[in-house]
Amino acid sequence: MKKTAIALVVAGLAAASVAQAAPQENTFYAGVKAGQASFHDGLRALAREKNVGYHRNSFTYGVFGGYQILNQNNLGLAVELGYDDFGRAKGREKGKTVAKHTNHGAHLSLKGSYEVLDGLDVYGKAGVALVRSDYKFYEDANGTRDHKKGRHTARASGLFAVGAEYAVLPELAVRLEYQWLTRVGKYRPQDKPNTAINYNPWIGSINAGISYRFGQGAAPVVAAPEVVSKTFSLNSDVTFAFGKANLKPQAQATLDSIYGEMSQVKSAKVAVAGYTDRIGSDAFNVKLSQERADSVANYFVAKGVAADAISATGYGKANPVTGATCDQVKGRKALIACLAPDRRVEIAVNGTK
């Protein structure tokens, strides 16, 4: 009992000290992120057509906020809103920037997460981003912008991400994420406005972020189920005829009352133990006690107790409760009456409340 109490205290302290990987349900969070973006698909073809070099990598950053809808059984679900500078690609000629493609916009996504370790989630996001793409061209090597050649588009793009998030504290989390944005913008040359060059790249980025979670407080501790143990003892002379294993009709009311109490115990495990007095051979007494235990167990199974949740064992004359009380009793009838407490069936029920 003392060891069990200590174990429950230790478990409670451990649960209180570990931050949940995902925020608590029905709470908000907000954060910032930064990293490196890389443009793919179409950039090389555009640079070749314009006869310029290109630079695909750039700095990216953003802000985000979310609402935690679900956090149960290691599974989390949140909705996230953010605004990003998605990065820029540059056309280069003789070491100078001659063209620039920049992107920024808002995005909305669903974020599903799974807790793999205490405080550590892996997650995936899927959503949509409304992206403004600006195409800037420069008329000379000094970087003077030609406003006549400037263009911009605003288009919806698919947004996807995978990452890992670790709760440093219940209120503070860090994340590492890879995000990709599909088919960004659609560049059209000014001299051919109805013709689209195949340039609407994908943008991949790797970001590190930090977020603050509002209204976390202490992580909820789930109380351990209360253990329930009950023991019932049946006088065999009331339950069975002497030397027999068949239940008497009047035993039904007693067994039904015990079954009513057993049914209040959750996840109950039932152990039925049969005992006899010391009269007779050991072999006969073990056999009789086993048959009596089986009769009681079968009655409970017929009432609804699962067969794999109940066991029956006959112990014969073992563990007498009369001790030496009847040692001086003379005569068979008197001895049988004195040893009546030893002829019993004990029922032990263990489960939770």
UniProtKB/Swiss-Prot annotation:
SUPFAM superfamilies: OMPA-like, OmpA-like. It is a multi-pass membrane protein. The keyword Hydrolase does not apply. Disulfide bonds join C326-C338. GO terms for molecular function: porin activity. Gene3D superfamilies: 2.40.160.20, OmpA-like domain. It holds the Pfam family OmpA_membrane. Residues 227-353 form the OmpA-like domain. Belongs to the outer membrane OOP (TC 1.B.6) superfamily. OmpA family. The extracellular loops are most variable in sequence, and in some bacteria confer sensitivity to phage and/or colicins. This is Outer membrane protein P5. The gene is ompA.
